[in-house]
């Protein structure tokens, strides 16, 4: 998360553990779909993984070229693909339709969180999180909403896998941030391939015989190379380990042979 995003979250009312809010979003709400336009929406590796699978496993190169604008985190140099809005009136999200989200089952984590914001930081005992309530002037979802806690909202929106994958990515970036130096361009390019282009990463694994150089159980190797949603999850998990290893020469989860 960049400084501007942190400042924005800090300006919002915090929703403490056990506190409730009332919100619903559906076609009956007058503002339905209005929040799905003119977005500044960064995509995480797990977001891209899920969206590509929804789109019949479209090639990663095609997905990134057609749907994103690639930027980078200034403090770490890690890639930061932004979902590209359509040109034209209102600049709508490329996945929104009059009936709602066309990728709803695999929509990005930020969309699932709304109207909550999640702030995280590395604490002594792991990831520490705080939740904030985003109340925009155009939104009528709060008018007659269902009462819930932040924890209930996360459960209903099936955010556990998103958070787990995104927190792993955040930990890797935190390690790089602690060095005070962003990734070199060559390593940043490798991060795009390994984290956002899992199809290309599998090709790299085969071409470079990576499994011959690191200690990966046979069952995990099979999972990583499987062309499936679960295989993609395993590949991303390994990619995060691999990036840590090649950046720092060691990894807490992966060792050289």
Range-by-range predicted roles:
Residues 1-34, 40-49, 53-54, 58-61, ...:
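Short loop/turn segments that flank or connect secondary-structure elements
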């Amino acid at each position: 998360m960049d400084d501007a995003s942190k400042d924005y979250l800090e300006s919002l009312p915090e929703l403490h553990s056990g506190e409730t809010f009332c919100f619903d979003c559906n076609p009956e709400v007058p503002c339905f779909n209005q929040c799905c336009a003119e977005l500044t929406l960064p995509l995480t590796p797990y977001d891209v993984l899920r969206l590509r699978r929804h789109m019949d496993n479209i090639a990663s190169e095609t997905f990134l070229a057609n749907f994103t604008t690639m930027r980078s985190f200034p403090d770490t140099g890690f890639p930061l693909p932004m979902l590209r809005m359509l040109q034209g009136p209102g600049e709508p999200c490329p996945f929104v339709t009059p009936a709602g989200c066309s990728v709803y089952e695999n929509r990005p984590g930020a969309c699932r969180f709304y109207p909550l914001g999640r702030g995280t930081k590395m604490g002594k005992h792991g990831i520490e999180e705080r939740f904030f309530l985003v109340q925009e002037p155009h939104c009528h979802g709060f008018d007659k909403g269902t009462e819930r806690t932040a924890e209930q909202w996360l459960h209903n929106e099936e955010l556990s896998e998103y958070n787990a994958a995104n927190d792993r990515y955040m930990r890797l970036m935190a390690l790089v941030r602690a060095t005070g130096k962003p990734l070199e361009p060559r390593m940043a390019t490798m991060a795009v391939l390994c984290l956002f282009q899992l199809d290309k990463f599998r090709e790299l694994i085969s071409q470079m015989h990576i499994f011959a150089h690191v200690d990966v159980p046979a069952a995990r190797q099979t999972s990583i190379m499987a062309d499936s949603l679960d295989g993609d999850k395993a590949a991303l998990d390994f990619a995060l380990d691999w990036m840590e290893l090649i950046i720092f020469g060691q990894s807490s989860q992966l060792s050289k042979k």
